Every structure is written in C-alpha cells, then in structure tokens.
Amino acid sequence: MKSAVEKLNPTEAKITIDIAYTDLKPFVQETYKELANQIQIPGFRKGKVPSKLIDQRVGFDFVVENALNEGLNAFYQQALTENELTPLSQPQVEVLSKPEENDREADTKVEISVAIRPEIELPDYKGLEIQVEAREATAEDEQKALDELRARFGTLKTVDRPAAEGDHVTLDLQALVDGEEVDAANDLSYEVGSGTMLEGIDEAVTGLSAGEDATFETTLAGGEHSGAEATVKVKVTAVKERELPEADDEFAQLASEFDTIAELKEDLKKQAAESAVVEQGIEARDKVLDKLVELIEVPVPEKVIEDQLAQHFDSEQAQASAEPGHDTEEHRAEVRQNAENAFRNEIILDAVAEAEEVGVEQSELIDYIINMSQQYGMDPNQFAQMLDGSGQAGMMVGEVRRRKALAKVLETATVTDSNGETVDLSSFVGTGDDAETDEVETEASATE
C-alpha cells in the first residue's frame, strides 16, 4: 500500500491510497468465505460453495465492494499514521479504480477527503502578564457565609404580614390561555425572589398577604402549552419567614465539627479568604487562555463546526428536546462562536501539553470523574460507565491533560491585581484545578 497527501488548506486534506491486489486479497478471500457460509446451493455443503458460483450468484463487484468495506479502514488508518495526520471528521471516500471482472487482480485507488487537525506554532507563552480584579475577604463575606449556614438549619414560621423577598409562600395557581384553563395547582411552596417558577411571579406575590391574590401575564415554559402566552391567577394562602438559629456554641456544635462559635467563625474566615484566591485564580486562568488565543492563529475547519451545528439543531434528540424559538439565527451564531472558541482552545492547549510533555495519572482521572459526577448529581461509577459506554473515555483523558497544560502556563504567568499588587496563585495552581467548578470548556466533541 502507498499513500500520498495533498493539503487543500490547513484543515483539510485529500489522501490518495494505492492498494496493491496482494494487500486487498486477504479481504477478498475472507468475503468469499463468509458468503460461502451464507449462500445455499444444492449439491454443495455450507461453507464449500466455490468462488465462481458465488460470483454468479452475487457478482464479483459485490465481493470487491464488501472486501473494500472490510479493509478500507485499516488502509486509511495506516495512511493517517504514515502521514502524521489527525482526522477531525468522517472521511469522504471516492473509489477511483478497483478490481473488475475483466481484471480481477487490478490495483485499487481511492481518494479520501477529511478535515484534519491544523498545525500551529507556539510562541513563548511563559511569563504572560495578566491583571485580575483585586479581591479580599471582608467581614461581610464572613457574615454572609455564617448567615447562609444558619439558613440551612433555620425553620419556617408563619407570619401575618405581606410577603417579601426571601419569604416562603404557599400558593394556588391557575393558568389560562385565551380564557381557557390549561393548568392549575394548589398548595405550592415557593421562595419569593428565587426565580424558579414562572416569569413574573416574584413581582406578583411580593406585597401580598395570606388570602390576597393577583393576576399577571407570562409565557409558559413547559408542558403541552410551552411557549404560549398565558394569564396566571395566583393566590397566597400563607406567608412564612425563615427563623434562623442563634449563632452560639450550641449552633456551632450542631452545624459543624467545632465546639465554639469562635472556632466556626475563624474557619469561615479562612474559607472566605480561600474563595477569594480561587475567584482570582479562575479569572487569571480564563485571561491566560484568552491571551494564548490572541497570540496564536488557529485555523478552524468549517466541516467540524457544521457537524456540531447539525448535532445541536438538526439531530432527532435535539429536535425532540428543543423549546420553541430554539433554532434562530442569533442562537445559531452563538453556538457557532462557542464551537469555534472551544476548538481553538483545544488545539492550543493540546500543543502546550505536547510541548510540556504533560501526562495523565489514573488518580487524576478518578478525581476528574468524581468532580464531574458531583456536578451532574450522579454516582461516580455510573458516570464513568456512561463515559466509557458512549466512547468518551478519550475525551476525558484529553480534558484532564488540557487542564494540566493550562495550569502549566498559569504557573509561569505574572499576575497582578487592579491595585498593582502581585497575586500569589500557588495554592490555586497547586490544587490541579480541583477547586474549579465552572471549568472552561476546552473540548470540541466532534474532534475526539
């Protein structure tokens, strides 16, 4: 087998593969063997049908096509390896010549068009200068953390006053479209200001006391009438406020591992300081990546982006779960931009990982699986099985490797805050980015 590559542009190649009949012959013989077991001809035992009779029954072209179907991927993979190409899309194959009835041992020639990973040149990325917002944990941050902890152990108490933000109200709801009831529910519990129910409900119930009602207009967001304009009647049947426990030693023992409220407050102060560093680290990480993208030109393959757009908008699964107004010109432009950005990030960080000889340990994969499974609310073992079953194990390794590569760049960056002070992110980088829960999306799924 011989192969040659013509790069049509930095992200697209045409591969010509010449396959000698001697290389194709094993696949032809295997095809005859399989057909001999499938075809029944009187006078011949199963598996003993001569190839000439098989040709008469199905045609020699059929045999060759099946042989090519079986063997072409191996030839294609060999050509990719020989020419050091990484494919990013499904190959488009054209068979230019192959064995025919009148020339049964002719060579085969195929042309394969495919999107490929572009080659980039990395600049000197060490010592990048980044500025982040000045952040310092304050007494207000510490008090907020304490109040949030107290709220988790608070109890709801019925009050005789108008509802305000943060209160819990009990509601009766009725939704009407064109004057006809389409949905109704009673005794719903809702936290005013949480924004987790219908748009407009917070404004409607704020200021209402038990027994009072209001009407507002909204767009239904789910169910059979999703997207419909509706008139909603809401009645408040109870108003409750959260009564917080006293911040004393007894509460500290109930809500934490500490014996005194002083120890608990000191720990919350430490957590607030760590959170400030994490926030600065995340901002610095994002800005380092933005700086790399500014410095490096990455050609983006149109085929890869089009495939992702099709998957996002046109697949049966996407159409089944899409809300009304999902496929708009503005949304397509947004998805396209996100896909292009993700592709550039991936290519750059893969190149950095290669330059830094970044590897991935099994323990790092386990940490990644645990962190991601928590974000999805899944058992880590089930999450790992889901990734493996969907063929995304390679994506997982690549994502961890890219995170480590970005941490390498961040390690050498000079980071200052908006006050001109040097920011020490050694604790943030030293976590291996485990503290990050709002990860930068660097993977473009169609490239794996």
Curated annotation (Swiss-Prot):
Q: Which residues cross the membrane?
A: none
An example of a Gene Ontology BP annotation on this entry?
chaperone-mediated protein folding
Biased composition, Basic and acidic residues: where in the chain?
324-334
Q: Which InterPro entries match?
A: PPIase_dom_sf (IPR046357), PPIase_FKBP_dom (IPR001179), Trig_fac (IPR005215), Trigger_fac_C (IPR008880), Trigger_fac_C_sf (IPR037041), Trigger_fac_ribosome-bd_bac (IPR008881), Trigger_fac_ribosome-bd_sf (IPR036611), Trigger_fact/SurA_dom_sf (IPR027304)
Cross-referenced SUPFAM superfamilies, in alphabetical order? Answer: FKBP-like, Triger factor/SurA peptide-binding domain-like, Trigger factor ribosome-binding domain
Residue ranges of every copy of the PPIase FKBP-type domain listed in the record: 166-245
Record's keyword terms, sorted: Cell cycle, Cell division, Chaperone, Cytoplasm, Isomerase, Rotamase
Q: Which reaction does it catalyse?
A: [protein]-peptidylproline (omega=180) = [protein]-peptidylproline (omega=0)
Q: Which Pfam families match?
A: FKBP_C, Trigger_C, Trigger_N
Q: Where is this region: Disordered?
A: 314-334, 424-448
What are the EC numbers? 5.2.1.8
Annotated Gene Ontology cellular components are: cytoplasm
Q: Which residues lie in Acidic residues bias regions?
A: 433-442
Which GO molecular function entries does the Swiss-Prot or TrEMBL record give? Answer: peptidyl-prolyl cis-trans isomerase activity; protein folding chaperone; ribosome binding
**Quick one: where is this thing mainly located?**
cytoplasm
State the top-level EC class: isomerase
Q: Where in the cell is it found?
A: Cytoplasm
What is this protein's function?
Answer: Involved in protein export. Acts as a chaperone by maintaining the newly synthesized protein in an open conformation. Functions as a peptidyl-prolyl cis-trans isomerase.
Comment, domains: Consists of 3 domains; the N-terminus binds the ribosome, the middle domain has PPIase activity, while the C-terminus has intrinsic chaperone activity on its own.
Q: State the family it belongs to.
A: Belongs to the FKBP-type PPIase family. Tig subfamily.
Protein name as catalogued: Trigger factor
Top-level taxonomy? Bacteria, Bacillati, Actinomycetota, Actinomycetes, Micrococcales
